[in-house]
Amino acid sequence: LPVPYFVFGDRKPYSGCIEYVDQAMDYAEKYGLKVLIDLHTVPGGQNSYDNGGITGVCKWHRNPKEVAYVLYVLERLGERYGHRKGLLGIEVLNEPISFRVYLFAPSRKQALDQGEAIGSSHVPMRFLKTFYKEAYETLRAVMDPEKLIVFHDGFRLSRWKDFFVKSGMKNVMLDVHVYLWVLDSFLHFHNP
């Protein structure tokens, strides 16, 4: 279930939607289903795509205040749903973009407000690993231990080998999105 960072309605001008997440959880429990809550957007964007909430902008990771805010949102989601029967788990961040995807994906669009895009870049691996450790600790502290904490590979699958085990993380899952529509761009870039 994709949710935005303003899910609780505390970021103007956006209205929240937490009542719909509550409803989805109620329905899931009523009908024996499980919900994976996926934090799909962050303030300032994590991938520069529309599904990250703001096209052409990717600079959330450069703003410590917004990074802390996202951890706070995850904590609140974990507190609210971490003991619910209908929760499968929480995915901490949808599709943080890698350097290669940021530069070469064919559908990358320009920001409507070019000024807002200033400072945008890919999400560095070092930052992502640090953020994932913090998100894990934040969620694990407030959720039942059998609930999954899910991490997107950031389009860098091979870079996660042993990371979760070496970090001592339990009951985690790595989410991988394979988009064949970008394959030609990558092949052409690597094999001109």
What does each of the following model-derived ranges do?
Residues 4-7, 59, 70, 74, ...:
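Residue-level preference for alpha-helix termini and adjacent loops
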